Amino acid sequence: MFLLHEYDIFWAFLIISSIIPILAFLISGVLTPIREGSEKLSSYESGIEPMGNAWLQFRIRYYMFALVFVVFDVETVFLYPWAMSFDVLGISVFIEAFIFVLIPIVGLVYAWRKGALEWS
């Protein structure tokens, strides 16, 4: 029962860090004046009037490459600490890391075979 007191600081920090943003949104909602007008409905581009159509479409290919990059970048972030302590951890962690690397590679090969990475 006395072990629960070890987490009191964690729970206090979690509650306070949850209350502060909620309180900030509530205060800004109460104090903000509500004004309707043409300025509120116009597009904003770095303080100048937008030229041409403000709505641009991007090809989905950009997002596919960005998603593949993010997946392998996050994988690299997780593999770096493993590589630094490889000699201490042993063969079982090597097998787990191999599976961890194999899953995104299988997904990449599948996307490649389906033509998701073709630019044209």
From Swiss-Prot:
Keyword entries, A-Z: Chloroplast, Membrane, NAD, NADP, Plastid, Plastoquinone, Quinone, Thylakoid, Translocase, Transmembrane, Transmembrane helix, Transport
User: How would you describe this protein's topology in the membrane?
Assistant: Multi-pass membrane protein
UniProt GO molecular function: NADH dehydrogenase (ubiquinone) activity; quinone binding
Q: Which GO terms describe its biological process?
A: photosynthesis, light reaction
Q: What is its EC number?
A: 7.1.1.-
InterPro entries linked to this entry: NAD(P)H_OxRDtase_bac/plastid, NADH_UbQ/plastoQ_OxRdtase_su3, NDAH_ubi_oxred_su3_sf
Q: Name one GO cellular component term.
A: chloroplast thylakoid membrane
Localization (cell):
Plastid, Chloroplast thylakoid membrane
- The UniProt transmembrane annotation reads 9-29, 64-84, 88-108
Reaction catalysed? a plastoquinone + NADH + (n+1) H(+)(in) = a plastoquinol + NAD(+) + n H(+)(out); a plastoquinone + NADPH + (n+1) H(+)(in) = a plastoquinol + NADP(+) + n H(+)(out)
> Main role?
NDH shuttles electrons from NAD(P)H:plastoquinone, via FMN and iron-sulfur (Fe-S) centers, to quinones in the photosynthetic chain and possibly in a chloroplast respiratory chain. The immediate electron acceptor for the enzyme in this species is believed to be plastoquinone. Couples the redox reaction to proton translocation, and thus conserves the redox energy in a proton gradient.
Query: Which family, according to UniProt?
Result: Belongs to the complex I subunit 3 family.
Q: How does it assemble?
A: NDH is composed of at least 16 different subunits, 5 of which are encoded in the nucleus.
Protein name in the entry: NAD(P)H-quinone oxidoreductase subunit 3, chloroplastic
* Source organism of the structure: Dioscorea elephantipes (Elephant's foot yam)
Give the classification, highest ranks: Eukaryota, Viridiplantae, Streptophyta, Embryophyta, Tracheophyta
